Amino acid sequence: MSHNDTVRQSFKKQAGKFTVYHMSKTEYTDYLIQKVAATGEEHTLEVAAGTCICGRALAPFVKDITCLDLTEEMLSEGKRLAKENQIDNIYFQLGNAEKLPYEAESFDLMITRLSFHHFAEPEIPFREMQRVLKTGGKLVIWDMEAVEEPLRVANDKIEKMRDPSHTRILSREEFEKMFQKDFVLQCEESTLVPVNLDSWMELTATPKEVREKIIALMKNDIYGGCSTGFSPYLQENKIMFDHRWLLLIGVKNKEDREE
């Protein structure tokens, strides 16, 4: 099975629960819209959009938005919710972030949320986003930020146990390196997002035996055993941890640069 097939299989299972799970995080989406500061004239693309959480939230503030995703079931849920909310400037495209079906310099604004840790080769979709973004346009990436190096392997291992489509969480430095050549960063900030362990595993329908292993690892960490890289803690007798989300907003350079 190819990695893209693994992604489709994983998110097909998540489609019906995805929006409900992320409704508890609407304040973060609201903050994102504020930071994007759209003018209302942007032709916009959301890449690896899932159920188009950002696209639906951003639609009232841009000229139009296209939501592209690899998984048909996720887009179908996005279409249903857009219709339910009477959003009429949103469009949906089944497609691969590694080969965007658009001409160069097609969009004024591009956004992708929680996608890069599912890409097998993150540089490829990044270059594609850079290609189809207009000079002077904004690229917005909101994704998880890797924990410090000694703990990254353990952290990614548990992420992959929970969701086989997970590849690797990138560090701030790795994101900065991708932006370095063709963008000027306007925003670079991180936020801690609390996560309930049970809800997190429920979203991906993690098998019972795998859940039990993850719970055991988290409990062991809480009580002084081997670190998981998640820094889990108890809150009202529930296991919690904080994901660090990194928001980067870059403006594509107006100067052409030699390769």
Task: Give the predicted meaning of each segment.
Residues 1-40, 53-57, 77, 85, 140-163, ...:
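Conserved class I S-adenosyl-L-methionine
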Residues 123-135:
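A short glycine-rich, Lys/Arg-flanked "PGG" loop and its adjoining helix->strand segment in the class I
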Residues 108-121:
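A short SAM/SAH-binding and catalytic strip from SAM-dependent methyltransferases
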Residues 51, 186-259:
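Conserved Class I S-adenosyl-L-methionine
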